[in-house]
Each structure stands twice: as C-alpha cells, then as structure tokens.
C-alpha cells in the first residue's frame, strides 16, 4: 500500500458543487484534496454540456458549463486544492472519531478528517465497446482514461470514438506514440471543430491512420493487446497492430462504490441533515445532486448553498478546539488577504 496522503478534507467529485466547497472550506483555513473519476474537472458541466448555456446561476444571466468551471477554478486558486483525476474511490475505512482512510482504484490512499461526497448523480462509468472479449484486456492494455500520458510513450495506440475525448487524446498522445490509429463508425465527428481540423491535419501528414468502421475483434495474450480487426464501411476488413487501446464510447451514471460506505440511502440518494448536510456517519457530508431531503431542488445554486453550510460544520472536525467566527468577504481583511485582495 502506498503512503497515505494526509489532508483535512477529501472531496469526492470535482463538479461545480465540489469546487465551490473548496472555496468555502478555504476561507476557514481547511486544506482540501479532490478525487474525480473523470479526467478533467467540472463534472457534468464539463463532460455532458460544456458549451450548453446555463441560465440560473445567480448574478450571471448566461454562462456555459465550461465557462462556469473556469470561473470556479479561478475563484479557488488561492487555496491551492490538489486534484486526483481519473480515479474512483473504492473503499472508505473509519480510523478516527472522525477520521477516514480512503483508497482509490489507482491505489492512492488518503487519510482525512472529513469526507465530502459531491458526486452528482453518482460515478460516471465508461461504456464498454461491443467487442467480444474486450474485458480480458481491460486495465492492462485497454484503458478508458489516461492517468499518465507517459505510459503510452512509444506504443502503437488504437483510439476508438468520435467525440471530444477521442479527439483530445488523439491530439495529446500523437506526439509521443510510435503509431496511432483512430477508428470511428462514420466520417463525421462530434468534437470541437478545431480539434477535428487538427486531427485531419495529422491524417494528411501521415502521422495518424484514420479508419472509418468498427472494431470486430481483438488479438493478444494474457491481457496484452497485439492487434485488432476492423470492419470498414465499404465492407472490407483491415488488420492493425496495436498494444494499447483507448475506447471512448461515452459514459453512464451509476451510484458506484458509494453504496458500500455504510451510508443510509433512499432511492440511491444520500439523506442529510439540512442544517449541516452531514450524513448518518459523523464526518461524512453529502452535497449536490447526490443528496436528498424534503424540498430538495437539483440545482447548482442549491449545491453552492449546501457547500457553504457543510463547511461551517466540517471545520469543527478539523479544528475542534478553535472558535470559528463567521466573517464576510466584503468586510473581513483577513479573508481578503487569503483571497489575495489588495
């Protein structure tokens, strides 16, 4: 087991509610690490509707999911939160009163005084491609996220998909791989136009092999890919060499391992105390779409409110002997100093 990362608070989920919770906790001198199964911050805003307008953020008539994420990241910059992306919490073990040892599927271990679940509707789980036997290669040579780019250096990479994730990793990994093949079922891509243009430039320069069709079979031994068979749209067949495959077929939402953490659940949601947003387990809080209480509205602004109240209770676990005086950022010079305001 790797050495534990010690932090005051660990937040599960780096969507808008998790990010704003960093701000509220930071004002109280609470240090935060965040874990998210996605490979980028922003949660549903970044993954499902980055360019979709949002009209119900107070004081902002219209902002996109991407724009909101960028603004929140700028707002929390003074507090230097640490992000662990592309990882999913697997186990939560109580080690104090309160205190928790938390382990991710990547083997990262945290020890925290407070755990905040801000996981939206649950964990985004990658959709498995409809290729026979693909599960035998998962985790060794078939990957649904890129955790460390250097692991793909010098490899023959096969990327499958036509959205932003497929295009982004095509562009990012192309300079370091030995060879790269991009497979999509049609010659029409859903990603950002600029990314599509850059991808086609790689094809034109011979740095990327674009195949229009579908993967029908994989070849390899002991979990290590060696090649793939592609049925092209003209009904011909292509055989390619590959030792790493990245399929991007979208995501589904599942509750995931949260169900095994000893929390009370109601219809796959976590009931909370509306004064503190604490769960039935002392020291574990739930904010945002993952929680439930009478009158709950699944709005981003509701999650912001919940994060503010959560922080006022969480700080008492972090600093049990410290008297916390509520202050306003408009008038408190100490808070303004933390924010870097002159």
Swiss-Prot record:
Cofactor binding, per record: Binds 1 FAD per subunit.
EC number annotated for this UniProt entry: 1.18.1.2
Keyword NADP in record: yes
Keywords attached to this entry: FAD, Flavoprotein, NADP, Oxidoreductase
Record bears the keyword Cell membrane: no
Record-level Gene Ontology MF annotations: ferredoxin-NADP+ reductase activity; flavin adenine dinucleotide binding; NADP binding
Needed cofactors: FAD
Residues the entry annotates as binding FAD: 17, 36, 44, 49, 89, 124, 289, 330
InterPro entries, per database record: FAD/NAD-bd_sf, FAD/NAD-binding_dom, Fd--NADP_Rdtase_type_2, Ferredoxin-NADP_redctase_2
Catalyzed reactions per annotation: 2 reduced [2Fe-2S]-[ferredoxin] + NADP(+) + H(+) = 2 oxidized [2Fe-2S]-[ferredoxin] + NADPH
Self-association state and partner proteins as the record states: Homodimer.
Family the UniProt entry places it in: Belongs to the ferredoxin--NADP reductase type 2 family.
PANTHER family: THIOREDOXIN REDUCTASE 1-RELATED-RELATED
HAMAP family: FENR2
Name this polypeptide is given: Ferredoxin--NADP reductase
Organism (species): Rhodopseudomonas palustris (strain BisA53)
Source lineage: Bacteria, Pseudomonadati, Pseudomonadota, Alphaproteobacteria, Hyphomicrobiales
